[in-house]
Each structure stands twice: as C-alpha cells, then as structure tokens.
A protein has these predicted regions:
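Enriched for short, Lys/Arg-rich terminal
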Residues: 1-5, 16, 20-24, 54-59, ...
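Basic, amphipathic "hinge/linker" alpha-helix immediately C-terminal to the N-terminal HTH DNA-binding motif
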Residues: 6-10
Length: 82
C-alpha cells in the first residue's frame, strides 16, 4: 500500500487558501497523484527526484519514492514565486 506524507509547510499553505473552488481542485489533483504517482512533470537539476503538477495559478511539488512506495507532498507555491 502507498504511504502518504505531508510536509507542514504544504498543509499550512492549503489552509491559507480561501477559495473553495481552488481547494477542491487541489484536492482532486492530490487524489490523482495518489492514484497515478508519476503523473507530474519530473524536475531536473537541484530539484531532481521531485515532480510538479500545475494547478492554476499554483504548482504542487511532491516526491514519489518508488523504492519505498511513498509519496511526500512537499510544497504548494504560486507559479511566479519560483
């Protein structure tokens, strides 16, 4: 079974979002990631080993550790804050 972990920063940023529609969209994408962990775009260079999924206007960053059968949700940030 797939193990799910959330970083505290990730949860804080989701709590700050006031828009219900956006929260629902994020929830759907998190479910999608859990079902298909390799759905996100693989990152390169300093972010190697992580993946990102674009949820307008945010990017959801996560790590899929295939050997450990684990997903770690790392961050949710505005696309202009890269």
């Amino acid at each position: 079974m797939l193990e799910i972990e959330h970083k505290p920063e990730f949860l804080k940023k989701i709590e700050k979002i006031k828009d219900r529609g956006l929260k629902e969209k994020i929830k759907k994408h998190v479910t999608k990631i859990i079902e298909f962990p390799e759905v996100g775009k693989p990152m390169m260079y300093s972010r190697k080993g992580t993946r990102e999924l674009y949820i307008q206007p945010f990017r959801l960053s996560y790590a899929y550790l295939k050997s450990e059968n684990k997903i770690v949700f790392l961050d949710l940030y505005h696309k202009d804050e890269q």
